[in-house]
Amino acid sequence: MKITIFGGGAWGQALAFAFAQKNEVQIVSRRNISTALMPLNEILNKNSHRIILQSSLEESLNSELFVIAISVQALREWFIRARLNQNSKILIASKGIEEKTGIFVSQIAKKFISLENLCFLAGPSFAKEIILGLPCALAIHSCNPILAQKFANQMPSFIKPYIEDDIIGGEVASAYKNVIAIAGGICDGLNLGQNAKASLLSRGLVEMCKFGEYFGAKMQTFLGLSGAGDLFLTANSLLSRNYRVGLGLAQNNRLEDILRDLGEVAEGIKTSQAITQISEKEGIYTPIATEIQKIIQGKSPLESMSTLMKK
């Protein structure tokens, strides 16, 4: 089967490697893949002969399945530019909330593609470990279980896919955990200890559950791979960009410098802004997301953590 991956970042390349174990894959990206993320490219070149690097969007639209792994903030523009057929079968691997509108990924995508033709990937997964072929489990959220199973069947043996029907829950969990991961990095960067961090992460999980339930998500989704699983991974590892943003903020580094050093998007930054706007509008209590947004805007990380521990 032929699969097109849109997005040449670490996540897009990792998914290309994974799907290429069973399929012919092409990556479409506006970035120069040959010079970006060289360690990943070396592994791709050594382990797969089925990956084609493609720069032309038009020439990439002849695949049976499509995977989108670009920044959520660029997703709307991408759909407008791509002009995909309404019947295109798409797996969206982007995680976040659109900052300027405060809407979820599915709400953006269904303006261009029928929800029946959309699936959403979630769960604990670092690009580096996927490219190394290390085992992991992921969730595919969709209202169309047949399509979700079709994507699941294309995954390699080292990935165990689970089919879920809670689209909103998967989206909220995938987006919100990035914000809590920034908080986890700040907690570690300030050397507040494991007791404080355990309190922060457990309260963060409750916070994202309540936020998701407000929009109709299922509680069980947040206790599974898409919620707790992804949160525990992302908030505890240097492989996590959002966690490293938190570390940098705790050390009083400028956000611009932190992002430059990362070289990749950290979705939790924009997502914290979107969540804060939504919670203020809807009256949802989101203290951790609110404090993270204040830190991004210049508030002392230590003062914010102190505020949270007193609530």
UniProtKB/Swiss-Prot annotation:
Sorted alphabetically, which keywords does the UniProt record give? Cytoplasm, Lipid biosynthesis, Lipid metabolism, NAD, NADP, Nucleotide-binding, Oxidoreductase, Phospholipid biosynthesis, Phospholipid metabolism
Where it sits in the cell: the answer is: Cytoplasm
Q: Which SUPFAM superfamilies match?
A: 6-phosphogluconate dehydrogenase C-terminal domain-like (SSF48179), NAD(P)-binding Rossmann-fold domains (SSF51735)
The UniProt record lists the EC number as: 1.1.1.94
> GO molecular function terms here?
glycerol-3-phosphate dehydrogenase [NAD(P)+] activity; NAD binding
Q: Which domain of life is it from?
A: Bacteria
The cellular component terms of Gene Ontology attached to this UniProt record, alphabetical and capped at eight, are: cytosol
* Pfam families, A to Z: NAD_Gly3P_dh_C, NAD_Gly3P_dh_N
Q: What does this protein do?
A: Catalyzes the reduction of the glycolytic intermediate dihydroxyacetone phosphate (DHAP) to sn-glycerol 3-phosphate (G3P), the key precursor for phospholipid synthesis.
**Name of the protein in question:** Glycerol-3-phosphate dehydrogenase [NAD(P)+]
High-level lineage: Bacteria, Pseudomonadati, Pseudomonadota, Alphaproteobacteria, Hyphomicrobiales
